[in-house]
Amino acid sequence: MRSLLTSTLKTSFTAFLVFVGVFTHAQSGYSFKFNEQELRNKSNLAIEVPDGNYTVKIRLGNADRSTLTTVRAESSRLLLNNIVTQKGEFKTFKFTVNKRDKFITPDETVQLKTRELDKKNWDKYLSLAFDGEQAGVHSIEIKPNKKAITVFLCGNSTVVDQDSEPWAAWGQVIPAFFNEKVSIANYAESGESSNTFLNAKRFEKALTFMKKGDYVFIEFGHNDEKQRGEDKGAYKHFIKSLKVYI
């Protein structure tokens, strides 16, 4: 049996809450999005919010049965893995999720690849997925967090949020190792090299959110070395691009 226990969405200018029950329609300007096929395998909550970091306070457990719950965000970004509660036991966790869309300005966007067009990393929703043979969510509280340290990941397939199992990369797993004071913003995409990442305006989009105290992790190389031609390759184009990042 797979179930997600949520119902009424209460909103304010600073937070919104989801309580025990069943899903309801949007209130106060927030909207839900559900995929019928996905709901057969896991429960999904998608809430339309502006770009930014959001701290999620989630209480797992159930009064009538034991639970086993894994929580992911956006394109399968791991936050909580196989959390067990016994009958009548509840556990509370906090984590911070980075949400973004493809727009840099109203007239300028990140140049996404075709396979990215339907990815949750680039839509207008903050998406959470709850999975497990006995998944149980008692309540969810979501608040904007403008003080969180953001770690921006720039890279290729070894870093990207892989939304199709069994593929995975370290960039989508590392969020599980941080508390709510840190948010991982994974801009990586399969096939990218140091220069194509820049050309697609991925880094330009990230720059619109960077603030003092944030971090940028850059991992490129194996796609750069495949490039051929003057001023290309791991020892030329890569070095040139690296100077741009720095």
Predicted regions and their residues:
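Glycan-recognition and processing domains
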Residues: Q27-A46
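Short proline/glycine- and polar residue-rich coil/turn motifs
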Residues: I83-K91
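Serine-esterase "nucleophile elbow" of acetyl-processing enzymes
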Residues: L128, G132-A188, F203-V216
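A short tyrosine-centered beta-strand micro-motif
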Residues: G52-I58
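Solvent-exposed loop/turn segments at secondary-structure junctions
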Residues: D64, S157-D161, E189-T196, H222-Q227
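Bacterial Sec-dependent N-terminal signal peptides
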Residues: M1-S28
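Short, surface-exposed beta-strand/strand-loop-strand elements in extracellular ectodomains
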Residues: L60, D64-L80
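Alpha-helical cap/lid subdomain in secreted, periplasmic
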Residues: K201-I246
